[in-house]
Structures are given as C-alpha cells and as structure tokens.
Amino acid sequence: LDIRRQRQMCIRDSIRTVWESDEIEDLRPDQQRLAWLVYDGFARNGAMLEGEARERYAAINQELAELHTRYGNNVLADEEGYVTYLSEDQLSGLPEAFAAAAAAAAADRGREGEYAITNTRSSMDPFLTFSDERELREQVWRTYYSRGDNGDEHDNNALIPRILELRNERVQLLGYDNYAAWRLENRMAKEPGRVFEFLEAVWAASTARVAEEVADMQAIADAEGAGITIEPWDYRYYAEKVRQAKYDLDSDEVKQYLQLDNLIAAMHFVAGELFQFHFSQITDGSVPVWHEDVTVWEVTNRNTGEHVGVWYLDPFARPGKRSGAWATTYRSHETYDGLKTTLGSNNSNFIKGAPGEPVLISWDDAETLFHEFGHALHYLSSNVAYPRLNGGVRDYTELQSQLMERWLQTDEVIDNYLVHVDTGEPIPDELVAKIRNAATFNQGFETTEYTASAIMDMKYHTMDPSDLDV
C-alpha cells in the first residue's frame, strides 16, 4: 500500500511539473490540451491533497463507490421484482402488438396466459398511454415511480442523504462550498446561481404550458363523462386523446410504420451518406457478445474499405439490464501507441415481440434511437492521437445526438424506410404532415418533468445535507 501511494504521488508530482513547465508551450495544441486535462483531473479529484485530508478523501471515495452500487442495484431489483400481471379482460385499449409482447414477457416469467407489464419505462409508457383501465394505470404509475422507495430491503431513502453528505464533504476538502460549485466550475454555467436562474426561467414557461395541456385533457375527460380530475397516471392517456383531437394523429397508427429493423437500416444509410460509413453484420460468431440479443457490426469506410471500428446493438429489455437508452464505448480511437479503433455500442430497452413478429416502436422511441446513434457516430468519427481527447466537452456532448434526431424526419429516410408492417406501403404524406405538425405537442409536460429533476438535483447539491429528509 505504501509503495502504491508513493507511486501515485510521484505521478502526481510529474504531472504538475509538466503542466507548470515553460516547455509546455513547445508541445502541439492537442498535447497541451491533454496535459491540462490530466493535471486538472488530478487536482479536481484530490490528488494534490496531503496527509489526513488525502486519507479522508480516499475513504470517502471508497464509501461512495459502495453506496452508488447499492443504489443502482436497489433500483434494478425493484424493476425486476415489481411486475403487474393482467388478465385478458384487462387489455382494453392496448395495441395488439403491445399485448403480444406483454404475453411473451409473462410467459418468460412462467405466467402463461397472462400479460406482464414490467417495471421499466419501455413497458410503463405505452401502458399509461393506451390502457382504458384507470385503476391499473394508477398501479403501474405508482409502481414505476416508487422504485427504491418501498420501505423494504431495496429502499434507497437512507442512502440518499449519506451520498449527499459524502459528496459535500469531499468537495469541501478541495475548498469548494458545495458539490454543485465543484461540478460546474469547468462547465459553461460556471456557478450554481446561473443554473438556478436558467432553470427558474424555463420552469415558469413550462409549467404555464402544462396548465394549458391539463386543461385540454380535463375538457376531454369531462366531455366523456369520466367524472375525474386529471392525475399523473391519467396524463399520458389523455394526452394521446388530445393529440388525436387536435392533430388527428394516432400514435399507434404511426407505430405501424416504425419497424425496428427498418430504422436500424435507416440509421446505417444516414451514416453512409454523412460519414461514408458502411455497416456489415458479423454473424459467424467470431466476435463474442454478452447476450444472444446483441448483434455486432463491422464499420468500414465505404470508399476505401478501411476498418473504422465495431458497433454493437443491444436493443431489448431483459432482467438485470438497467432501463433507458444509452451509448457507450469499450475502446476509444487512438494512434499514439499504435492504431486502436473504436469498439462502441447502442443500448435500448424495447419490448421484444413474440417469436417471428416484427418489433414496432413509437415515434418518440425512434427519435431516441437516432439520438443515441448520434453518440455512436461521434465515437466512430474520432480521429485523435490520445484516447483522453475523445468525446469532447461535457456541455457540448448532446449536440451531435440532437442533430442526428433530425434525420429521422428527412424525406430520404421517410420515403425509403417507413413502410407499413403488413402491407409494405410507404407512410402516407398526410400522416407525415400530421407528425410534423404535432412535433411540439406535449412539450410542456416533457420540459417540466426534466426541469423538475434538474432543480431537485441542484437543490440537493447546494443545501446542507445533514438534516435532509427525503
């Protein structure tokens, strides 16, 4: 242990010497950038501390690592452990494809003849959007939003204050007032006050829009004689009714033109047009995968044939897999110690259909698929000497993915890849027009949902956590 500490301190001192040396100006710009990132990373993560402060910092890191793992495992346990099972007479309003996928999910869990609504967003969202069963909608909503908050062995309420306390103590060892101040120092906002100012401005506008959206929903519920006041578990259901009333747009009708396999082909087409990438699926088993659902593709330059990297796609939900959608790399491009090419993946949680059935996804999910593929294209397009320089700065990292979303609505993609699952007919122009007209529909809710999380995150990380009651 002493030898390891001595080595760490020698590395630290060497990095500081390099950065503070006059010779830094003789390096190439990318080398200067690398030197700064390494030096700043060491300094911001406690490497310059000495004595007891250094020991305490290391102990905090160890405890936080354990707490973060426990927290994530608790959420995952609740996603796996809480499943709502339906009988056939409780399927009212649900699309056939969704019901078939729910039946397959139940069968996988040994519940033949029933229908499983799993505790993941990919299952919860469509159920809350289409199910006519209000009591079941409430049950599914409460189950999802209570992950890690059920008062059992997987409850996270005791972990949250401890995590916040440790984060706060750790940055105070570095001289910062709170965790948010430390986190924002090297971001565009620079300090918490600016973030709060921005979020509060967004909050005022988004909540005003939400009030209008809820009023539209309430009007439809009243006209139907529902005799209810709109609650959170009603929001998606009545939002879909408002969408149909205002824009004559049926989400399930749109979904019939959004086959997952076709969308993957569309993404590959866009990558070819923009970056000259060609994707060839590897099916001979020569590349190991972590699950049978994962497909592997070699990426080459379609003009030169040069190998660019390997792309993995892990599209379906399964027990033990965290929810959501994301992109990641397992190896980044670099050349300083010989050429190493990118190994990266896209991961989603679509509901796997019955054997042989095509997987249909919503327009929102299709946008997310394209969004995350934008991150993968960023990885694959990298051309840097040092792996530390991959990825760009955090504030900017969503730009390429947000741009990629726009390609879903281009004529080239729509005309060639959005075809009806049964007839093969291209999506009608009038339906495309409706999709485009409704592009900003429900933005009040979506913006408020995200902003609320951001405000809570900021408040948690700027307040004194010692007396926090979660």
What spans do the regions from the language model cover?
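Active-site-proximal, well-structured secondary-structure segments within enzyme catalytic domains
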Residues: 30, 34-36, 63-69, 73-118, ...
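A conserved hydrophobic secondary-structure block that centers on an alpha-helix together
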Residues: 37, 46-60, 147-182
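The catalytic-center signature of Zn2+-dependent metalloproteases
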Residues: 382-409
